[in-house]
Regions:
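Conserved SAM/SAH-binding beta-strand->alpha-helix loop
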Residues: 70
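S-adenosyl-L-methionine
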Residues: 79-110
């Protein structure tokens, strides 16, 4: 399907202060943009914006960024935000970026993003385009460059072939592990808890299409293999409280993991 160009999109986005025009300049400093040091969640391919705007309103303790590649698509989400703004209901903890997902590492620093949402992404059905799918291992490598060690990727779709492909990619991934999945989200009492539907989700669900969802996380054992095999570390493993690419917070055996510690370490 050919994307319809909307001539006024560029001017509307340019005038909206919530649209970040030079996102690369904020790499590593996104908390300065939001004025609050809070976890950062992003949605890649935010569509009309209902999902992320609802999340932002419900969770003021989290900062959100909606990403779209095309200005004519991002326009719809920005206009929805502006409607809420006119009513005095717009969440303050949301920003928008018009960019290609391939450029994520130039916009976000390592361990700067806590969660990535992928909702009803383009399935790119032709086999030769598999690398373009947002749930391909090519993209999981990019996500690994920006996610915290406890970061997650959440993916929803009604496209079963795409979902099966995504599961297979995770099963062969060297960086992520599959934590949860459902082939019928709306009838899954556990995974559907707190679910916020996108516009597409509501449409496809009303047509009787089951919605699939998976949650994946970084495989920390691959990040610090020595830590998980050293007998002394394993003996005191219950005291290990947090690991990511930059920090290890621990007690009782900080001397043992000194080689892994880089900065801002806190003993519990």
């Amino acid at each position: 399907m050919r994307l319809r160009n909307i001539p006024r999109a560029e001017s509307v986005l340019e005038a909206c202060k919530e649209v970040v025009k030079d996102p690369e300049s904020l790499r590593g400093d996104w908390n300065l943009e939001f004025k609050k040091e809070q976890p950062l969640h992003i949605e890649i391919g935010m569509g009309k914006g209902q999902f992320l705007l609802t999340l932002a309103a419900k969770n003021p303790q989290i900062n959100y960024i909606g990403i779209e590649r095309y200005s004519s698509v991002l326009l719809r989400a920005v206009e929805k935000f502006q409607e809420l703004e006119a009513e005095g209901k717009a969440p303050a903890n949301i920003r928008f970026i018009c960019m290609d997902a391939n450029d994520l590492p130039t916009v976000f620093a390592p361990a700067e993003v806590s969660r990535i949402y992928l909702n009803f992404s383009d399935p790119w059905p032709k086999a030769r385009h598999a690398r373009r799918r947002l749930t391909s291992n090519e993209f999981f490598k990019l996500y690994d460059q920006i996610l915290t060690a406890d970061g997650t990727v959440e993916f929803k779709t009604d496209n079963r072939p795409l979902f099966d492909f995504s599961v297979e990619e995770l099963e062969t991934s060297e960086l992520f592990v599959l934590n949860q999945l459902s082939y019928d989200l709306h009838n899954d009492s556990t995974m559907n808890q707190g679910n916020i539907m996108t516009e597409y989700e509501a449409k496809f669900s009303s047509m009787g299409n089951p919605i699939c969802k998976l949650i994946a996380s970084a495989d920390n054992m691959l990040q610090y293999p020595d830590l998980y095999t050293d007998p002394v570390c394993l003996h005191f493993f219950p005291f290990l409280s947090y690991i990511n690419r930059e920090h290890i917070l621990c007690s009782c055996f900080s001397w043992k993991v000194e080689a892994y510690v880089t900065s801002d370490d806190t003993e519990l």
